[in-house]
Amino acid sequence: MDINQDLPAIDSHRALQIWITENLKMLPLPERAHGNFFEECCYVVLHVPQSPKATQGGSSDLHYWIGKDASAEAREAAVSFVQCLQEDLGDQTVLHRESQGHESDCFHSYFHPGVIYRKGGRDSALKFAETNMYNVQRLLHIKGRKHVSATEVALSWNSFNKGDIFLLDLGKVMIQWNGPKASISEKARALTLTCNLRDRERGGRAQIAVVDAENEATNLLRIMEAVLGCRSGSLCPSVPSNSVSQLQKANVRLYHVCEKGTDLVVQELATRPLTQDLLQEDGCYLLDQGGFKIYMWQGRKSSPQEKKAALSRAVGFIQAKGYPNYTNVEVVNDGAESTAFQQLFWSWSKELDRKKHPEKSKLVQGNLEVGKLHTQPELAAQLRMVDDGSGKVEVWYIQDLQRQPVHPKYYGQLCSGNCYLVLYTYQKLGCVQYLLYLWQGHQSTVEDTKALNCSAEELDLMHQGALAQGHVTMGSEPPHFLAIFQGRLVVFQGNAGNKGERPPVSDTRLFHVQGTESHNTRTMEVPARASSLTSGDVFFLITSHVCYLWFGKGCHGDQREMARTVVSVFPGNNKETVLEGQEPLYFWEALGGRAPYPSNKRLPEEVWSIQPRLFECSSHAGCLVLTEVLFFGQEDLDKYDIMLLDTCQEIFLWLGEAAGEWKKEAVAWGLEYLRTHPAERSLATPIFVVKQGHEPATFTGWFVTWDPYKWMNSQSYEEMVGNSLGPGSAISEMTAEVHNFQLTPRLSDNKAGHPALQAFKGSQDSPENELGLDLRVDGANPSMNHTSSCSDSMVNGSLPRERLMHQALEDLPPGVDPARKEFYLSDSDFQDIFGKSKEEFYSMAKWKQQQAKKKLGFF
């Protein structure tokens, strides 16, 4: 059979399309089956980004997914299909190999709130896609923080552990059991998945219960024990995470792959840091990212045979290296590289990319349009400006490890031996916003830096936690910081005096002026010698008698105008303008004589549109672990998270309000991210810490849409639990019926399952039936260990009717469940009041029970 003739039609207007492969055919899955993967199958997944801001450079992503129990034939068919599809889709398609339980972040990002691994093969998959099943008994093991997965495991207490979450799914009853070591964020995300399963597969009809503390949920444990049997012994300990640290991901090696005769040659070319010029357009290259992921890069002039062999070569490399079979593989084409691939290199030149693909060369203009910054946050993000810098400014500096105010006349005059706090207050759509910059001089001490951070915490407390914080290193100030001082930022060598006074300009000093506008101009003191000059810029040479304003031959009008503005910072000296090549003798004498210096013109800096990356931060064994969220939106920011947004020029750490003690690690995590980055990023990159509900436009502008009121409606985990349980009476009804269970396992009936389950299954055969949990089984349990965790059988109580009927909660006898007051009646009183036996009553539909209880004073 010719696979090419059986390729499915591609709908370019659908973001996600999934096929299951079987017998040389690709069978499409309906959308409601997306995210469910059967372990004996292989799948093909195509993602075509629909939003320009959510793309990876405009490329599509083609994945083939391998179930852990898939046959060799199914795997081979999947490979053949994806290779033919990739050829049909063209060079703008990135090919991924995914293995069950070890999928890439890109793959997981398609499926919210998570992926589900199910037992079975093609028949089970197609049956699931066609019908809505209520006759279900399964246990799902739920794992993950940002990328959640649920795996079907054996119905046994042996499947449980203390650190994860398990969902006992009984069709119309779904019990989420939370391990005592599970975090609140894991519980919340698991509950979101549970609710999604209820709504997608059960039409919202199933009832959800949550076990957070077993001693407070004895009724629910009775149901679990009916299904799982008696639990003997303690639970298994938490399973260590298999997360890959950033340090391991930073270990990158590049290989050239080619054929010499009949031999395949794999030659190592370079290790970290890699440079883009190593990739030649007529070659094929393999990039090994610490054994965590293998990339195959194909030059646009490489042969069709080489392109077709890329995947098999990557798999062969994995086997030769002894890496796990589930190691991720990504095949990328020249010009369609993902952002993750590009950032493995020390730099990814748009100039080189533009020469190959001129149609992609669109420069983002850097002109500041102040009026649009508040209404167009995407512009604010690109220009890195929350406004034009005209707001209120307060400045402090660290002296003797204390925060001291700087006199306003010295604002913008910083010293390399000090640390400064710059508090900027501005209005955004009628609301007061704060941005606190922490500026660190190159010659400041470690003690000063600690005092700087402590002072920032104090200021944050004074402003009720509303400060966004920007950690700035001398010489790497962001545009908005420069705009605050209207282009007059001058950094002196040495330490500040009283009230932040600059060092006295008594000796000869040389200052380098760089910039053309108020938001990109800084003036830095440099060694006063001729070799510090460059022909492309402007310099001030200050002596005891005169201030020379030196214009290099390569500088242009905007630079000269800004320099004339900055020179006003140095009052009192006679000012003389000197052109390069026309310097007076005294100019050179002041610099200690002539010396060679760079004479090339400064090229204008280009600001390119880049694809930002969003990561969830966590720590494992003391190392930073990042989980990337692709195609991200505001909904990916969870109140329990610390998220890292990398825009290349800046790093943002977003702190959810419930992130807890990890908030203190945010800046350290940002520095570790830069330090362990495969591209060896500069540690001077500005790091901004922003808090939930106080995000500046320079952060929100990187998101497709942003709702400033979203956080006002955010729910706590406890509120999520309450809302997930449906009407307040629903869970009470279920637990009331649990007290009717007489749990008696029959060991001789293992194949059929627990007798209680047989009764329970019978009540679920029709999705139209109301929930009926009559799991009572007569007889004693001869094998029950009284020291085990199994609950004792509930014996019907007998209380006078007057102590139960029409009684408020506080007036009920101790131990009476207010949701099932009628249960404590004697059998004769129950028959007399309700006109039927308890057995007949509890076999009624729930709404009928509720109606009768309300009428007779038991609600």
From Swiss-Prot:
PANTHER family in the cross-refs: VILLIN (PTHR11977), VILLIN-LIKE PROTEIN (PTHR11977:SF30)
Signal peptide stretch: none
Q: Which Pfam families match?
A: Gelsolin, VHP
- Family from the record: Belongs to the villin/gelsolin family.
Q: What is this protein called?
A: Villin-like protein
The record's listing under InterPro entries reads:
ADF-H/Gelsolin-like_dom_sf (IPR029006), Gelsolin-like_dom (IPR007123), Gelsolin-like_dom_sf (IPR036180), Villin/Gelsolin (IPR007122), Villin_headpiece (IPR003128), Villin_headpiece_dom_sf (IPR036886)
**GO BP annotation list:** actin filament capping; cytoskeleton organization
Lineage top rank: taxon: Eukaryota
Asked if Glycoprotein is a keyword of the record, the answer is no
Keywords annotated in UniProt: Actin capping, Actin-binding, Calcium, Repeat
Known role: Possible tumor suppressor.
What one GO molecular function would you report for this record? actin filament binding
Locate the HP domain: which residues? 793-859
